[in-house]
């Protein structure tokens, strides 16, 4: 799994040093022979010349998908994806983006998810199960209100998607229930686009999972251009974990070490291009999730078991 895959195209890129590099990471992932590849958003980077036209949007997808280093991975395993702002439109875009239906249409054509929305609910939303792990893939853009709205309670998921998520989690019989969403959830700091910028909905999500007694929940997120594992202790029940994994080939956020996320598990901050593996083991009733994070060459940087 990974997020933030920027593929250079000089004619459309910013001047100076190319933003994307380290494409060999895709071969390193391929060499691990994963059963599935989970793309955590910003899987493409729409440029200013792309997001206003169908031609531009489809060019960006085909340009990214044509990368030679990507071909073995694309052809060798199952792929599931969520979207984030750069898949949808401009940087930090929200549900007000005028062309979101066209970018959603392109997402549907280039990703083979089981569904794109649930019933009449629109967006890049779906779920799938792999063994005793179930994945709930959310859309954090389609219903999102702009940060800083003052006359309404802001939302990332919207009521319909929020209610569906809680119902689906409650109904799930899976040992591991992964909530997959672009931006960080547990980090309590309201920085950039973390869920903490939407405090009412953020609190309601954590409280509802706790009050409903939903077992086995963990968050998988991208976006931040660094990797870390966060752990939220909860009174009387198991802790919630969040694995943030980023970037694949985009630039690295140099300020991550000084961002004092109080929930960060010591020794898990990674400030280089990387990907993560999730491995499941153990007998029924005694299952273990092992997380390992690897650099662009495939070298293991850290591992933790939950």
Where do the model's predicted regions map?
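Metal-dependent phosphoester/phosphodiester hydrolase catalytic core
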Residues: 1-306
């Amino acid at each position: 799994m990974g997020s933030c895959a920027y593929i250079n195209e000089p004619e459309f890129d910013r001047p100076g040093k190319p933003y994307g590099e380290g494409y060999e990471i895709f071969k390193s992932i391929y060499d691990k022979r994963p059963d599935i590849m989970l793309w955590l958003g910003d899987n493409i980077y729409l440029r200013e010349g792309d997001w206003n036209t169908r031609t531009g949007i489809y060019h960006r997808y085909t340009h990214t998908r044509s990368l030679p280093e990507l071909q073995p991975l694309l052809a060798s395993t199952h792929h599931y994806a969520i979207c984030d702002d750069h898949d949808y439109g401009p940087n930090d875009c929200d549900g007000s983006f005028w062309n979101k239906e066209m970018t959603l249409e392109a997402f549907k054509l280039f990703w083979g998810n089981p569904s794109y929305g649930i019933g009449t609910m629109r967006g890049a939303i779906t779920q799938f199960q792999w063994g005793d792990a179930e994945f709930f893939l959310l859309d954090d853009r389609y219903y999102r209100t702009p940060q800083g709205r003052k006359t309404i309670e802001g939302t990332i998921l919207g009521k319909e998607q929020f209610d569906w998520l809680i119902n689906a989690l409650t109904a799930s019989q899976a040992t591991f229930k992964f909530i997959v969403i672009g931006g960080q959830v547990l980090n309590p700091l309201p920085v950039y686009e973390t869920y903490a910028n939407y405090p009412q909905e953020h609190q309601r999500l954590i409280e509802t999972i706790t009050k409903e007694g939903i077992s086995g929940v963990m968050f998988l997120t991208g976006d931040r251009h660094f990797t870390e594992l966060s752990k939220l202790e909860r009174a009387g029940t198991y802790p919630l974990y969040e694995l943030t994994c980023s970037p694949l080939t985009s630039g690295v956020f140099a300020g991550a070490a000084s961002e004092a996320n109080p929930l960060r598990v010591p020794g898990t901050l990674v400030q280089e291009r990387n990907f993560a593996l999730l491995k499941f083991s153990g007998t029924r009733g005694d299952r273990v999730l092992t997380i390992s994070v690897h650099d662009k060459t495939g070298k293991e940087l850290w591992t933790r078991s939950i």
